[in-house]
């Protein structure tokens, strides 16, 4: 082990953590929102975690890839309970060994899977790069509620249009996260960091929202009258229902589901968002076959 050069310190820390044994799940944790903070190395994940906790709970260094996973850490803010699922970060392969890369990626992916809400951190100075897209893409593929958190906002030269320009750039680069809210912060100065937690509460509520079947079908039927299914008049969506939350998942029953184009389903998703919100939450739409008795 070399403390100066960081040689083998990752393995040492892992050995120390293992001595603690598995963390026990407290009954109070049931009501807590589990938050995973993800992003590329040195984007400010550890600084944000420490700012939330008000202490140096996570090891921080200027050298990318030196943060090690902490045990899940519960904390409270404004009467609400949270659990931070800390991550090792997804590192560039050129900077670390292949074995350590695989190890850190697996731990990050597991953290995402265990989270209720994921904070996708970006660097305001460097902007969106390919590594950010890959991380955000995985969060989206896992259908996890998420917030895009742009850190180091204090280092950006600003004018009246700066935030609008950043919004446009991020939306262009991360088109698949059009539903995700944006928050600009400085983890170092703690500017707006607790606004992030307020947004976490909101997004978690949106992600667990359930819509009554009658209300749902009224909205969908009106949307289909305004913009009917293209193609054959024989193709019909008969009704829909919500089968789960987190993420909100809807089943649409059609007499010929194979003939319903994905662009029309995207239209229906936009209708759901316009009427019911679901901000920060992915939506899953499923088509199933049900024969029309009128046929």
Residue spans of the language-model regions?
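C-terminal-of-GTPase-core extension/linker across diverse P-loop GTPases
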Residues: 1-85, 93-106, 110, 114-120, ...
